[in-house]
Design a protein with these regions (language model features):
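Active-site/binding-pocket entry motifs
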Residues: 51-52, 62
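Short acidic/glycine-enriched loop/turn segments that link adjacent beta-strands
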Residues: 37-40, 62, 102-105
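Vicinal oxygen chelate
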Residues: 3-11, 60-84, 87-125
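Short amphipathic alpha-helices in soluble, non-transmembrane regions
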Residues: 18-21, 81-85
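Alpha-helical elements of the RecA-like P-loop NTPase motor core of helicases
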Residues: 16-17, 79, 119
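Core segments of cupin and vicinal oxygen chelate
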Residues: 6-51
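Eukaryotic scaffold repeat domains enriched in small/polar residues
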Residues: 55-56
Length: 125
C-alpha cells in the first residue's frame, strides 16, 4: 500500500490551487506545509484533513515519469472530479467511463494537470 507521493511541479501555488479544486469532490485538500531542513526540500501536503499523503515540491517536472490514481467512493464522485478538474484547467486525457479493458467494475476519468502529469480518479466495484 502506498503511503505518500511527492510530485515535482513548476509552480507550487498554481498546482496547489489546481489540485485543491480538482480533488474537492474527494474531500482532498491542502493540509500542511513542511519546511525542509537538512537538505530536505520544502513540501506542501495535500490530504484528508488528518494526514497528508500527496506532496508537492518545486522543481523541474517530468510528466513521463509517473502516473497515479486516487480512489473515489462511487462513479458519481469520478464524474464530479472530472468536472472539477476541467473547470480548474485540466486537459482531457480520458473522459469518465467504464474501463472494460481492465475489468467490468473499473470506472475512471484521467486528466493532465498544469505540468502535463497524467492522473486519474477511479471507482472499483
Amino acid at each position: 500500500m502506498i503511503d505518500h507521493i511527492i510530485l515535482t511541479v513548476s509552480n507550487v501555488e498554481h498546482s496547489l490551487a489546481f489540485y485543491e479544486a480538482a480533488l474537492a469532490p474527494l474531500d482532498i485538500k491542502f493540509f500542511m506545509p513542511y519546511k525542509g531542513e537538512n537538505g530536505h526540500p520544502d513540501l506542501w501536503g495535500v490530504g484528508n484533513g488528518k494526514s497528508a499523503f500527496f506532496w508537492l515540491k518545486h522543481g523541474k517536472p517530468d510528466p513521463r515519469a509517473i502516473h497515479w490514481g486516487f480512489m473515489a467512493q462511487n462513479n458519481a464522485k469520478v464524474d464530479e472530479f472530472y468536472q472539477a478538474a476541467i473547470a480548474a484547467g485540466a486537459k482531457v486525457n480520458i473522459s469518465p467511463r467504464a474501463r472494460m479493458e481492465y475489468y467490468s467494475g473499473y470506472y475512471a476519468a484521467d486528466v493532465f494537470d498544469p505540468d502535463g502529469y497524467s492522473f486519474e480518479v477511479v471507482h472499483k466495484s
